[in-house]
């Protein structure tokens, strides 16, 4: 999220927010990450095989049924997000409208408009949509920003429950309760940004609990402190 914001603002400063520039930027990011993994990683964690008997046993349990229902629901919402283009009023009036303006002027700078929320509303979700639009040449993936935020939020909620002392069933129930919020289901296949903000706030809460739980053993390392600040900053953005 921070890299995406930096790329967006950096390219916009030179009015170079174009498909070519964004593509080059993400290619460089991918190359740097691949180089880091090759040079500094000692090795990846060993793969732990899961037997078919274990899977069948889990699927027959109450937790397995709840997780299965949540996965099916998420897949259906994801399919709708990909198939159905953005059509709701918010998408047309400012979410997608500001994205098209930014792409047209090759910058996220302010522009003349009588719909002022295109200028002052939190822009991070639309930054992401703009990147997807520039990289693919279509708005087909615009709704996926909310959908991926929903999936990430459910994972974060489960981890938060674990940090608060819940057992495996408690983690599953936390994810199910969060995933079945009616408004969340409706918005997860749109370009609205509620789930995007919720995801970064959930990340902030998890990191905060992570630092709280192990201050003496590990100390709050700079990486976790940085994640704490960045997550709340991205939630506001």
Language model features with spans:
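Transmembrane-helix motifs of polytopic, lipid-linked glycan transferases
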Residues: 2, 30-39, 141-165, 203
């Amino acid at each position: 999220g921070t890299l995406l914001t930096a790329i967006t603002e950096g390219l916009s400063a030179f009015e170079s927010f174009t498909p070519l520039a964004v593509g080059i930027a993400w290619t460089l990011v991918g190359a740097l990450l691949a180089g880091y993994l090759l040079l500094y990683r000692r090795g990846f964690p060993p793969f732990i095989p899961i037997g078919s008997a274990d899977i069948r046993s889990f699927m027959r349990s109450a937790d397995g049924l709840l997780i299965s229902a949540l996965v099916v629901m998420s897949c259906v919402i994801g399919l709708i997000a990909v198939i159905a283009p953005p059509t709701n009023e918010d998408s047309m009036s400012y979410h997608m409208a500001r994205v098209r303006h930014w792409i047209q002027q090759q910058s996220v700078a302010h522009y003349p408009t009588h719909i002022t929320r295109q200028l002052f509303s939190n822009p991070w979700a639309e930054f992401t949509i703009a990147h997807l639009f520039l990289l693919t040449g279509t708005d087909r993936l615009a709704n996926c920003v909310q959908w991926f935020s929903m999936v990430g939020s459910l994972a974060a909620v489960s981890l938060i429950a674990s940090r608060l002392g819940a057992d495996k069933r408690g983690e599953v129930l936390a994810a199910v309760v969060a995933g079945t919020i009616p408004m969340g289901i409706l918005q997860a296949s749109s370009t609205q940004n509620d789930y995007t903000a919720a995801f970064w706030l959930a990340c902030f809460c998890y990191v905060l609990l992570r630092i709280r739980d192990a201050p003496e053993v590990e100390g709050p390392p700079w990486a976790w402190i940085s994640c704490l600040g960045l997550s709340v900053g991205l939630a506001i953005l």
